[in-house]
Design a protein with these regions (language model features):
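Enzyme catalytic cores with a strong preference for nitrogen-chemistry domains
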Residues: 1-363, 381-390
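ATP/NTP-dependent adenylation/nucleotidyl-transfer catalytic domains that generate, transfer
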Residues: 161-163, 219-220, 229-232, 246, ...
């Protein structure tokens, strides 16, 4: 384990029907491979120790005896393995046969979790062989030992308290009220599902949505291991679709019709953080009180130190995809829909504020940069919704020491092409006079030099807003606010900040979307040039007429800064 991550796996072994010896050997081989890769939790399919499709052979004493021998081999091999296994198998208890997941750790059976919901419809007839699992935990005997058996079992790691495991089997997750709901409310952070779900047309997509949706609803990790090749095809075909999901996101999915072992690193810290943030995620019915907890220990030093070279992993590599632009959809169609949605949300927010205050005027400091451009576009949309003339949008451009011809021209052209009013107020003399009043050296280009300009601009915007009875529209975006990249009592102040929840990486796409869809070539050309302009507050004098102060040279590219806010917002 490393930085709150834990490596988990869903494995589909090659099996033979009614051959526990062969099947246990295949399970052990996958266990060895997983251990070499640093896997700490490994889930196998339903009844994989015998095969799901044994039919009436399940009722034969010979098969049940050999199944226990297979389990013994697994237990023996697991003694030196620092991991927890969920192995599907039949289990006799008080004269009845149950479909269960045996939970194994270091040569010990931690518990036996029976399947509660036995399908007996369509192609399934499990009630012919098995008894529905009990919720209340009982003790079952194994080799002279008393083992807890029941649905309401939690398996908690002493050395990593964030890791609390629970199990359900196949059909259990397909019912209206799956056991995993109670598991999660009782404290389980990772759900293991030993499954044997057959293939029918379109079922793979439903299965994918079901598992990802359940992990989202329960704010948990979900490891789904499905039966595959090796099962009898007399009545059913199994595709071995394995899925590892976390809080609604599929971390990895196996190809169907090919037995495989998939691995991923779950972020338990994210799960705990998200549950803490969701104040509605709580055990209203005190379900935890009916659960029993079994404790185990794992080595928490490093999940990656044993990665095999065959896997092509570096020792410090995390087995999960880290989206470099988490706020921006990669699919073009989805990205367009997202941009339209965000622009509508921004405009609706401003529309309500304007209508509530009966405000008919807006004041925007238009610099020719990305943020003020987006603020103008949002304001235009809100004014159009309210049927307020666009000339009531007062764009104020305030050139000073750092303003370049490029941004100045773009600001002026943009205001004219959108139909907004434009006023130019050169603040050079006002700022120079202010610096003279406070005895600041004009050649000293320090924070006073920069912030003096920003505060002068805000003062002008506020005064004009008073004069026209309008509202100053804030331009700062979420990335700048998260970094504190703003001037106190300067550009961080406004009456309504329409960009406050929009990261800089997304600002670019919103402006580009508007440029692509506005239907006005001259306006589109200006917007595209704004996109091509380096991000800058333009508070330092230009060099050879070009921007000398580039924000991303000072605070690093904004792409880096979107990761932290995304993690903070979404756990």
């Amino acid at each position: 384990m490393k930085d709150g991550f834990i490596r988990v796996a869903a494995a589909t072994p090659d099996i033979h029907v009614a051959d526990p010896q062969y099947n246990s050997e295949q399970i052990i081989e996958l266990m060895e491979q997983g251990s070499a890769r640093g896997v700490k939790v490994m889930v196998f399919p339903e009844l994989c120790l015998t095969a799901y499709t044994c039919s009436d052979l399940f009722l034969q004493e010979t098969l049940l005896k050999e199944t226990k021998n297979g389990l013994k081999r697994i237990l023996q091999s697991s003694k030196s393995k620092d991991m927890v296994l969920f192995v599907g198998m039949p289990w006799m208890h008080k004269g009845k046969l149950y479909n269960v997941a045996a939970v194994v750790n270091r040569g010990r059976i931690l518990g036996i979790v029976p399947k509660k919901h036995l399908p007996n419809y369509s192609e399934f007839y499990e009630l012919r062989h098995f008894t529905p699992g009990m919720e209340k935990v009982e003790m079952t005997e194994w080799e002279g030992l008393q083992i807890p058996m029941g649905m309401k079992l939690l398996f908690s790691c002493r050395t990593m308290p964030e890791l609390v495991l629970a199990a359900e089997l196949c059909e259990d997750v397909w019912v209206p009220c799956p056991p995993s709901i109670s598991h999660a409310l009782a404290g389980a952070t990772v759900i293991a599902n030993c499954s044997a779900s057959d293939e029918t047309t379109g079922k793979d997509r439903y299965r994918y949505d079901l598992i990802c949706g359940q992990s989202a609803r329960l704010v948990c990790g979900y490891i789904y291991a499905n039966a595959g090749e090796g099962e009898s095809t007399q009545d059913l075909v199994f595709g071995g679709q394995n899925i590892i999901a976390e809080n609604g996101t599929c971390l990895v999915q196996s190809d169907r019709f090919k037995n495989a072992c998939i691995c991923a690193d779950m972020d338990l810290g994210r799960i705990i953080s998200e549950r803490r943030r969701m104040t509605t995620f709580k055990d209203e019915e005190n379900k935890a009180s009916s659960y029993e907890t079994v404790y185990f220990e794992l080595n928490t030093e490093d999940i990656t130190k044993k990665d095999s070279k065959k896997a092509g992993q570096k020792n410090d590599e995390i087995l999960r995809y880290i989206d470099p632009a988490p706020f921006v959809p990669h699919d073009a169609g989805q990205r367009e829909r997202r941009c339209e949605e965000i622009l509508s949300i921004q405009a609706m927010g401003l529309k309500k504020r304007l209508a509530h205050t009966n405000c008919k005027h807006a004041v925007i400091g238009l610099s020719g940069g990305l943020d003020s451009t987006l603020a103008l576009l949002v304001t235009i949309r809100a004014f159009d919704m309210l049927r307020i003339p666009r000339e009531n949008i007062h764009c104020i451009t305030m050139p000073c020491f750092g303003t370049t011809d490029r941004t100045y021209t773009n600001a002026c052209t943009m205001a004219k092409k959108t139909g907004a009013s434009l006023t130019e107020i050169n603040i050079r003399d006002a700022v120079t006079g202010h610096f003279k009043d406070i005895a600041h050296d004009m050649e000293k280009h320090d924070v006073t030099y920069e912030n003096g300009q920003a505060r002068e601009r805000t003062q002008i915007l506020m005064d004009i807003a008073n004069e026209v009875g309008g509202m100053v529209i804030g331009t700062g975006d979420m990335s700048e606010l998260a970094l504190g990249w703003a001037t106190y009592n300067g550009d961080h102040m406004s009456m309504y900040g329409v960009n406050a929840s929009v990261p800089k990486t997304l600002v670019r796409h919103l402006v580009r979307y508007y440029a692509d869809t506005c239907g006005e070539k001259e306006l589109s050309d200006v917007l595209l040039d704004v996109l091509d302009t380096p991000v800058s507050p333009e508070l330092l004098p230009p060099e050879d007429g070009k921007i000398s102060q580039k924000t991303e040279d000072l605070v690093n590219p904004y792409g880096y800064h979107c990761l932290a806010p995304h993690t903070g917002c979404r756990g």
